Amino acid sequence: MPEETQTQDQPMEEEEVETFAFQAEIAQLMSLIINTFYSNKEIFLRELISNSSDALDKIRYESLTDPSKLDSGKELHINLIPNKQDRTLTIVDTGIGMTKADLINNLGTIAKSGTKAFMEALQAGADISMIGQFGVGFYSAYLVAEKVTVITKHNDDEQYAWESSAGGSFTVRTDAGEPMGRGTKVVLHLKEDQTEYLEERRIKEIVKKHSQFIGYPITLFVEKERDKEVSDDEAKQPDDKPEIEDVGSDEEEEEKKDGDIDQEELNKTKPIWTRNPDDITNEEYGEFYKSLTNDWEDHLAVKHFSVEGQLEFRALLFVPRRAPFDLFENRKKKNNIKLYVRRVFIMDNCEELIPEYLNFIRGVVDSEDLPLNISREMLQQSKILKVIRKNLVKKCLELFTELAEDKENYKKFYEQFSKNIKLGIHEDSQNRKKLSELLRYYTSASGDEMVSLKDYCTRMKENQKHIYYITGETKDQVANSAFVERLRKHGLEVIYMIEPIDEYCVQQLKEFEGKTLVSVTKEGLELTKFENLCKIMKDILEKKVEKVVVSNRLVTSPCCIVTSTYGWTANMERIMKAQALRDNSTMGYMAAKKHLEVNPDHSIIETLRQKAEADKNDKSVKDLVILLYETALLSSGFSLEDPQTHANRIYRMIKLGLGIDEDDPTADDTAAAVTEEMPPLEGDDDTSRMEEVD
């Protein structure tokens, strides 16, 4: 075994040992750690390696301005040395080390600001793994150790040893053992039931899980017994007596056992995100992705970038090939991005790092600005994190847009994560426009290919102001809908929205590129072709109706009257008119809340549209519109204000239908009388156009 594993067993007669009491809060914390059962004990190694990494960061920083600081040891590394015989695990670093004052203050007599906060968090049910966020990670050593010895050497002081069995006190003495040069050695004397942390496999597993991206080499020292072959020449010494062979014995090579120390670097996967993206191959990204996620498939897309300026961070984001089966489960952690601060892993479930709709993104974010001991509460308030989040979302959307340029790959992406895009449209108002460009739908004209809203807009008819859609359960179901059939007759394309989340999506997505999204199954459907006719009819009817709209409900009738949500029904209007003490002002207001719905598929309405478009000043249109309106009133259960005028219009239509000329002197007196009472028909010189209505 290397010299570092030798614990200090030298005589201590001449060494002065000082004993100190732990500060009250630290003693409480240690008692809590020792006497409470925690299943997640393995985090002790992460914390000690993280501390070593911090110490190495400090000496490296000092050496930038004063290279002589590294004269006491140029190599910056961390060694892990398990010793099964002594039941010790030693963590050695060549970091900045501690002076005697540092030892006394940092490891026992001065409580960190986070000590009390962490104890409160623990008692409230927080996980022990959060210990490092409160700056007291060192004490996690007592999760597995009954005694801890810390030997340290700082450039400005002698070599000292700190030791405690957590009995409320610790000792500090000058260390006369093997000179370290510079750095710190933490020797854990493990509890009898914690020897699993001496196993090579277990140590490798923990380092891979928690510390594989530490910026300094972590080397594991393992003693291996090897069978060493001994040649015949070596085996026989010059003085050996001649060997007498046993009769019948096989010729066998002599073997002897030899104990060797294997050194294996555990974190060869260097922080790939710190390298220049141009120097990294797809294979390297693939290996890193698999080591990060344990996914058996390669990633679908990757985005590697860094942000510099007032804020500095690097990020590496991956899109997996398939969505996890529990993507939208409530109990699932909110994201899969690991947060590092200066190469030290902080957490992998920081909800503030990325919005929920992007929770399928895997990767790492490494910030230079966040403090290492940041807590969840601090993260929630952190302005730095808000800026990081905004940048991550922006880069994710860029990545999806780039992916959309490759139809095949985007199809795979959309099959897996379309729900996330739609959830984003519902939740993320700031990026709604960009997200809407990523949507893909089947339409009544696209066949088996999904198209974007932009594609739909390029195929829109001239003067079409709306994007028409229908929601339903399956493509076949909505394709066979009567609503879709009507629009297809008019040459209009309808988008098929067949996922439940589409309903929530379109609640927020009101328009795309200035075109309003309109459901073909809801009231208020406007066909551009009939917009002009509806406007003309409203102008003619003035206050008689609140609005004129294209109907979704009519099949055989040319038009009908419906009341608005707040207007009176036909029956209610009849009842109110019969009231002796009625309020006439209310009558006029409530009675006016009628909607005239026209059937775009009816020949009367189509011919009327053509008539109005052929000559906007055709006065016969006015009579036809009023006649249609009054007839619709009757068929919808309402009464007429002036039945006689309506009757006169009907008689006039009958005359036209029979081909009777108004100027014919042989016309009967009754007809003449009717004609006198009736207002002159506007535009009656063109009887042929009136006949087109039939």
Swiss-Prot record:
GO terms for molecular function: ATP binding; ATP hydrolysis activity; ATP-dependent protein folding chaperone; phosphoprotein binding; unfolded protein binding. GO terms for cellular component: cytoplasm; melanosome; mitochondrion; nucleus; plasma membrane. It catalyses: ATP + H2O = ADP + phosphate + H(+). Its main location: nucleus. Its EC number is 3.6.4.10. Residues 261-694 are annotated as: Interaction with FLCN and FNIP1. The modification Phosphothreonine is found at T5, T7. This is Heat shock protein HSP 90-alpha. The lineage of its organism: Eukaryota, Metazoa, Chordata, Craniata, Vertebrata. The gene is HSP90AA1.
